[in-house]
């Protein structure tokens, strides 16, 4: 890999951005291939064990979140380079990235455990397909409502303003960089977590749904009217959820057990 220190700042930014986008593109390629092999709209019940689920989850996070996190990552790197030019310590940007990704990986583990527990209860309760579809609709409604909450707004604002985050959350050293990456990952998680949860009823390997969610997250974070787009999406999620509750079978798939059926 090209050294971050040996290149001018502008070229370094291009290298880092290129690597982020290349990794994201490769992740998308793997997801598309996996969806063709296993079925695009499969729910979490794909006969997956925890490790396989986490591997696919991390791949999905890289594909969907790296492009939207790029402005923050590049801002962090620029500040680190400026510190080095002043003779201060330099920390690799990839420490920040690793911590950011760790937060999403931990969330994937929690999501897997929660989905496994919920699906075990559903299986023991012998719920009908109509009931599971309605539960999926409720997940969509909750995701839509969350889009309109103050907590969502606070987390989104933190994700939209990289320099503000730098000024209010900066810490020196490797531990500081790791802490900052984890904190920014937590803000992104707070902003987007329910948008990922809806993949469970819609289909964990539904590439079309992943593409729409990625576009929504990018628009929310990057466009001047991103907040308005998020509010419109919230109304759409609530409407779709209500439709799934009232008309069972409207979802591409029903939630199944992550550990298999």
Model-derived segments and spans:
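Juxtamembrane transmembrane-helix termini in multi-pass membrane transport proteins
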Residues: 6, 54-101
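Residue-level signature of transmembrane alpha-helical entry/exit and packing/kink sites
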Residues: 16-20, 49-53, 92, 96, ...
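Residues within membrane-spanning alpha-helices of integral membrane proteins
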Residues: 17, 21-24, 97, 136-140, ...
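A small-residue-rich subset of transmembrane alpha-helices
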Residues: 87-117, 191-225, 231-237
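Transmembrane alpha-helix/helix-exit interface in multi-pass inner-membrane proteins
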Residues: 105-120, 132-161
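Alpha-helical transmembrane segments of helical membrane proteins, especially in multi-pass transport
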Residues: 146-154, 176-204
């Amino acid at each position: 890999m090209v050294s971050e220190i040996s290149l001018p700042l502008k070229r370094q930014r291009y290298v880092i951005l290129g690597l982020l986008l290349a990794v994201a593109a490769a992740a998308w390629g793997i997801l598309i291939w996996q969806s063709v092999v296993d079925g695009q709209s499969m729910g979490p019940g794909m006969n997956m064990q925890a490790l396989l689920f986490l591997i696919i989850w991390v791949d999905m996070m890289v594909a969907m979140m790296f492009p939207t996190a790029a402005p923050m990552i590049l801002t962090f790197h620029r500040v680190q380079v400026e510190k080095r030019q002043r003779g201060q310590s330099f920390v690799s940007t990839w420490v920040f990235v690793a911590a950011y990704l760790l937060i999403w990986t931990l969330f994937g583990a929690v999501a897997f455990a929660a989905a496994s527990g919920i699906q075990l209860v559903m299986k023991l309760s012998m719920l009908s397909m109509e009931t599971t579809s309605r539960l999926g609709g409720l997940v969509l409604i909750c995701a839509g409502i969350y889009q309109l909450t103050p907590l969502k707004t606070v987390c989104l604002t933190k994700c939209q303003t990289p320099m503000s985050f730098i000024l209010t959350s900066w810490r020196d050293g490797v531990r500081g960089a790791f802490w900052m990456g984890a904190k920014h990952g937590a803000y992104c998680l707070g902003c987007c977590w329910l948008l990922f949860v809806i993949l469970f009823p819609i289909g964990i390997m539904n590439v079309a749904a992943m593409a729409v969610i990625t576009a929504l997250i990018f628009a929310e974070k990057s466009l001047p009217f991103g907040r308005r787009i998020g509010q419109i999406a919230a109304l759409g999620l609530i409407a779709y959820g209500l439709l799934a509750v009232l008309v069972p079978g409207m979802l591409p798939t029903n939630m199944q057990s992550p550990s298999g059926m």
